[in-house]
Amino acid sequence: MPHHIVIVEDEPVTQARLQSYFTQEGYTVSVTASGAGLREIMQNQPVDLILLDINLPDENGLMLTRALRERSTVGIILVTGRSDRIDRIVGLEMGADDYVTKPLELRELVVRVKNLLWRIDLARQAQPYTQDNCYRFAGYCLNVSRHTLERDGEPIKLTRAEYEMLVAFVTNPGEILSRERLLRMLSARRVENPDLRTVDVLIRRLRHKLSADLLVTQHGEGYFLAADVC
């Protein structure tokens, strides 16, 4: 069954262009111009990925991103204006998986969409839990089959990008990882002109969810996980 993409865009020409392009790529595509329309679509059918313009007529797209992430692991790619750098960073902090800027480069966009959907499919195909699939560190358990993180049996919700970054650290414990290397490990961001600040945003988000002293900054070099892993 084709993946279902929802395009949330209030500019008619851009909306029609995206709908036509992704339909030709073989996806099932729904379109709406508002946050209310998105919620209605999600209530009536499964959604795999959302292309979300942050400037909507009825509500702030960044706040909508946070609301979506609180109750769903659906893929979210923000569509922002070229000058909205702060909004892009805030959007990632709110839980978006990725972002693109206008004017849209459709070939780059489809690569980002395909990579994110690939990661979503991997998570859905995860095998049942076994201890051998778990990395343990500082009281945490990162299960690489189920793509879950727990501490003392309590789940900690991670976005796909946060999960991928944490995997990079637990598989290289104590090793200093540069921002460039970490960015290459995030599959949805293997595109030209990557933004290294994406790494800093994800580090801040992980520090908020984990013990803050676990991810250590080595100034001028990168970050490392300050914990034994078994």
UniProtKB/Swiss-Prot annotation:
Phosphorylated and dephosphorylated by TorS. This is TorCAD operon transcriptional regulatory protein TorR. GO terms for cellular component: cytosol; protein-DNA complex. It comes from the Bacteria. It is found in: Cytoplasm. One of its GO terms (molecular function) is phosphorelay response regulator activity. Member of the two-component regulatory system TorS/TorR involved in the anaerobic utilization of trimethylamine-N-oxide (TMAO). Phosphorylated TorR activates the transcription of the torCAD operon by binding to four decameric boxes located in the torCAD promoter. Box1, 2 and 4 contain the DNA sequence 5'-CTGTTCATAT-3' and box3 contains the DNA sequence 5'-CCGTTCATCC-3'. Phosphorylated as well as unphosphorylated TorR negatively regulates its own expression by binding to box1 and 2. The gene is torR. Residues 132-227 bind DNA. NCBIfam families: PRK10766.1. Keywords: Activator, Cytoplasm, DNA-binding, Phosphoprotein, Transcription, Transcription regulation, Two-component regulatory system. The lineage of its organism: Bacteria, Pseudomonadati, Pseudomonadota, Gammaproteobacteria, Enterobacterales. PROSITE patterns: OMPR_PHOB, RESPONSE_REGULATORY. Its main location: cytoplasm.
